[in-house]
A protein has these predicted regions:
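ANL superfamily adenylate-forming
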Residues: 58, 145-195, 304-344
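Conserved pre-ATP/AMP-binding loop-to-beta segment of ANL
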Residues: 46-49, 165, 179-203, 210, ...
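AMP-dependent adenylate-forming
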Residues: 12-19, 37-64
């Protein structure tokens, strides 16, 4: 039985609310953090494996090794410390999904700061409410349009001290700022961050009322990541997994799958800011799995259907699509496949 204090007195009054907890299915040590996913991978596999890819043009990618990713994370972390970001301080990332988002996310996690993402489609007024509600002192946007959106509300956000822009080389600016921070100071901050420290505040969409901030610790995310490895190991860990990530990292779902990939032995994340050139990006990156919503897959299907046309190729495409649906239903039901595949020289 729980006891609560009444609003005006000091006496505890009993309630009928009871609280029960049970051990989780996966263990997370008290000193582990989201940053540990990266360092543990490096300890297992070294610095030379590819961990991420950043888009450099339509269908063009630049590979990032674990060593380079780690170097960028530590450099950004030093810059954040030099700026005055302390343990528990809130920093906003107002950006579409991109490589710099991932680097800053791990840098914030390393030093015990709190990532408060703002959805890239949010208005200035929505961003203002989140920034003021969580006490954000530093914001990082991806482009000029979102930078201007925040700049227009800067006077109404008393705690917001500075806005940086990824397209304006925010990572380089932080790296330059961080040269004054010693390795010892950085290591002390990393050592002072623990599993039960706050990692992020994720705000609800606000479709049914004012957005609510949901506080999540490092342990929260690490638990679901490890559960993911147990349940989806063949997808997340086996056969050189490659993830093409385009869902917004402001959502927990995309954050979770990013952490799963970074923490696996040889997973590679391809950060895709938008889906304007999704088909060539799919062909060039060659993902082994995707995280998406129905409209994304509908876009791929409709583009392929239009290209097939209405003649012979169109009929073959329709037959192949029907075959795929039957195959999937049969496999889900645990039965044997009865769908025949046809070839033609026509």
């Amino acid at each position: 039985e729980m006891c609560i204090r009444d609003r005006v007195g000091t006496a505890a009054v009993p309630t009928i609310i009871s609280e029960y907890t049970s051990p989780g299915d996966v263990a997370v040590n008290d000193d582990e953090t989201l940053y540990s996913l990266l360092t543990e991978r490096i300890a297992r596999t070294g610095n030379a494996t590819t961990i991420a890819a950043r888009k450099t043009g339509p269908g063009a990618w630049s590979s990032i090794t674990t060593g380079e990713f780690h170097r960028l994370v530590l450099a950004a972390a030093k810059g954040l410390i030099a700026f005055g970001v302390g343990k528990g301080d809130a920093v906003t990332l107002f950006s579409a999904t991109r490589f710099e988002w991932g680097v800053l996310d791990f840098a914030l996690a390393a030093i015990g700061a709190v990532n408060v993402p703002v959805y890239d489609t949010d208005s200035a007024a929505q961003a203002e409410r989140i920034i003021n509600d969580s006490g954000v002192k530093l914001a990082v946007t991806d482009n000029r349009e979102r930078y201007d959106r925040l700049d227009s509300i800067n006077d109404r956000c008393p705690g917001l001290q500075r806005i940086l822009m990824m397209d304006g080389n925010a990572l380089g600016a932080l790296e330059g700022l961080g040269v004054s921070v010693s390795d010892e100071e950085l290591e002390a901050r990393i050592a002072d961050t623990h599993a039960d420290d706050l990692a992020t505040i994720v705000y609800t969409s606000g479709s049914t009322g004012a957005p609510k901030g949901v506080e999540l610790t490092h342990r929260n995310f690490l638990s679901v990541v490890r559960a993911g490895y147990e349940c989806l190991g063949e997808v997340l860990c086996d056969n050189h997994p490659r993830l093409l990530l385009f869902l917004p990292l402001a959502h927990c779902f995309a954050r979770f799958i990013q952490y799963c990939s970074i923490g696996s032995d040889d997973g590679v994340v391809g950060y895709l800011p938008d889906t304007k050139s999704l088909l060539p990006d799919l062909r060039s990156f060659k993902p082994t799995y995707l995280l998406g919503v129905p409209r994304v897959f509908e876009k791929v299907y409709n583009a392929a259907s239009r290209k097939a046309g209405t003649g012979f190729k169109g009929r073959m495409f329709a037959q192949a699509a029907q075959c795929a649906r039957e195959w999937s239903r049969t496999e889900q039901d645990g039965g044997k496949h009865s769908c025949l595949l046809y070839t033609s020289d026509a």
